[in-house]
A protein has these predicted regions:
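Donor nucleotide-sugar binding/catalytic pocket of nucleotide-sugar-dependent glycosyltransferases
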Residues: 36, 131-177, 247-249
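Membrane-proximal helix-turn-helix segments that form the acceptor-binding/catalytic region
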Residues: 70-78, 93, 97-101, 108, ...
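A short helix/loop element that forms part of the nucleotide-sugar donor recognition site in Leloir-type
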Residues: 43, 125, 175-187
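Conserved acidic donor-binding segment of nucleotide-sugar-dependent glycosyltransferases
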Residues: 310-311, 315-322, 331-337
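Conserved donor-binding/catalytic core segment of Leloir-type glycosyltransferases
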Residues: 6-7, 145, 187-214, 222, ...
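A short, well-ordered alpha-helix in the C-terminal region of glycosyltransferases
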Residues: 324, 331, 338-352
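Short hydrophobic beta-strand element within catalytic cores of glycosyltransferases
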Residues: 266-269, 288-298
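Nucleotide-activated donor-binding/catalytic signature segment of Leloir-type glycosyltransferases, i.e.
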Residues: 232-259, 263-266
């Protein structure tokens, strides 16, 4: 019996990329165990494979990463398995050591350009530790996957490895019809903007989106998810008196989130070009907006802008500036004909950008392993 252990440091509830990996492995005949962590606010989890969410003494900082990797290492060392799948650099050390000691195959899926995230770029000593781990292990890896070609090229240039690309395009999901706005306590007479994501962190444009609402009295901004910018967003909305224009909804199951997104008029992805990770990012939310049939307002980052411009499914801004965001929103809603065209193009783009093709590519990479 083929057995795969898939590990990630989040709480498993909203990581659609990891869920897809587990589904593909299960379809290939693996018995799957997905390992993550349990947080106080973690949503309930129901999956057709085994899951383990570890309760840790530490929830952040170096002690969290040390505790998680130590516990993960011993779990991997003594659990029956034929294949290990490591998601992101913060699980790689435990997976690499266990794979080496046990002679097991290892797949590394890096969801971002990890050592270039702003949280590390702004803390050189911490970044040096992660970079040392990456430099020691990455050149030895045989099976590496990432989320887009820009990041694949950057890793190939840095380490020489061949890196496969599987984009974060969601597989088509059968969702029930979207509820009416009233059922979600949303106003009928306002244009609704949405920004969603599990990583609504600093430098991702959420603060600027909130400030833009000062100039958009006829709009409502929904921010769905979580991240380290959340307390800042709450404070901004409160201090600027924008609670009636900005609703922070927190994390929720995917289907519920898409109920809100499908009731929105415009999706926001406003990452700043302040670090290589954000520059090369291709966030899940872009594809969720397209699957919801709504146009996109995006910053001019290569991977995102290539889709928005190439599919003519939204508006690209030079940078995430509150005044520019507000002006773009006003201009878009003032031109019903242009808005309708962008909305139609978003629906067409969702059909063309087929998550099933990405799942098939992942299957071809994993087939024969373990």
């Amino acid at each position: 019996m083929k057995r795969a252990i898939v590990s990630v440091t989040n709480d498993l509830a909203t990581d659609n990329r990891v869920a897809r990996t587990c589904a593909v492995l299960q379809d290939l005949g693996h018995e799957v165990l997905l390992v993550g962590r349990k947080l106080p606010g973690s949503l309930p989890l129901e999956r057709p494979y085994r899951t383990k969410r570890m309760r840790l003494l530490f929830n952040n900082g170096p002690l969290f990463y040390a505790e998680y990797n130590l516990r993960l290492f011993f779990l991997l060392l003594f659990s029956r398995c034929t294949l290990l799948v490591s998601n992101d650099l913060d699980t790689l050390l435990a997976n690499f050591l266990a794979a080496r000691l046990r002679g097991k195959q290892l797949v590394y899926d890096t969801h971002e350009f990890y050592t270039e995230v702003p949280e590390l770029v702004e803390r050189p000593r911490v970044r040096a530790v992660w970079l040392a781990i990456e430099r020691r292990i990455f050149p030895k890896l045989k099976h590496v996957i990432t989320v887009n070609q820009s990041i694949a090229n950057a890793y190939r240039e840095r380490y020489g490895n061949e890196v496969q690309v599987v984009r974060n395009i969601p597989a088509p999901r059968e969702l029930p019809p979207a509820p009416e706005r009233a059922a979600l306590d949303l106003p009928e007479g306002k244009r609704i903007l949405v920004m969603q994501g599990a990583g609504i962190n600093v430098q991702r444009g959420a603060e600027e989106a909130v400030l833009a609402m000062r100039e958009l009295p006829d709009c409502l901004l929904l921010i769905i998810g979580g991240g380290d910018a959340w307390p800042v967003l709450e404070r901004l909305a409160r201090e600027r008196g924008l609670q009636d224009r900005v609703h922070l909804l927190g994390k929720m199951p995917y289907a519920r989130m898409m109920d809100y997104t499908r009731n929105a008029d415009l999706g926001l992805t406003l990452d700043k070009d302040t670090n290589l990770n954000y520059r090369f990012s291709l966030p899940n939310k872009l594809f969720d907006y397209l699957h919801a049939g709504i146009p996109v307002l995006a910053t001019d980052l290569p991977e995102v802008a290539a889709i928005v411009r190439g599919r003519d499914c939204g508006v690209v801004l030079p940078a995430a500036d509150p005044a520019a965001i507000a002006e773009a929103v006003r201009a878009l809603f003032a031109d019903p004909e242009r808005y309708a065209a962008l909305r139609g193009n978003a629906i067409f783009a969702a059909r063309e950008l087929d998550g099933g093709k990405e799942a098939a590519k992942l299957r071809s990479i994993l087939e024969g392993l373990g």
